[in-house]
Amino acid sequence: AGTLTKLDLPIEVKEKSRFVSRAGEKLASILEAHPIPVRDKVCIDVGASTGGFTDCLLQKGARQVFAVDVGYGQLDMNLRNDPRVVAMERTNARQLTLDQLMEASPHARQIDLLVMDVSFISIQKILEPLHKELKEITHWVLLFKPQFEVGRKFIGRGGLVRSQEAVEEALNHFGSW
């Protein structure tokens, strides 16, 4: 978001963000609330985008992170150049295979933590094929975004969900999966 100001108005940054995007703050708060081991782990970040989750995992001591995204050119340059990051852009997570991961890095068989923050698609559409392919993963941290889980008929103007009941139903359905 932006704000128009006068050219001569002094502007200062109160504090620098810890991560390359706000997504890192989201994951950090989850990891603080739920002590999931990250140090020395091999992780996969599905929906990496700019790399907020990837950055958070690295700062928490991850040994390697596979940064998977269907997009291209979004991953922060510092992360892209980090030898611990395996950038897998233009990669549809629904079609991702262990063989593809192994081609990218021999550490793929050691993936122990999957984090996911995706948009414009239900996480269930990604989870089903991923879980079949990567069933050995111990920890799964998923961002549940109601606007992509409830179905179009429950979405109002601006992409807001109109029905709390639909959100609860989608969450219950997901929980039973």
Listing of model-derived features with the role each one plays in the protein:
Residues 1-37:
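S4-like RNA-binding module at protein N-termini
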Residues 39-49:
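Conserved class I S-adenosyl-L-methionine
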Residues 44, 64-66:
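Conserved beta-strand positions in the Rossmann-like core of class I SAM-dependent methyltransferases
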Residues 50-62:
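Conserved SAM-binding loop of SAM-dependent methyltransferases across substrates and taxa
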Residues 66-125:
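S-adenosyl-L-methionine
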Residues 124-144:
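A short glycine-rich, Lys/Arg-flanked "PGG" loop and its adjoining helix->strand segment in the class I
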Residues 146-163:
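Short, glycine-/aromatic-enriched active-site segment of Class I SAM-dependent methyltransferases
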Residues 167-177:
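Short alpha-helix
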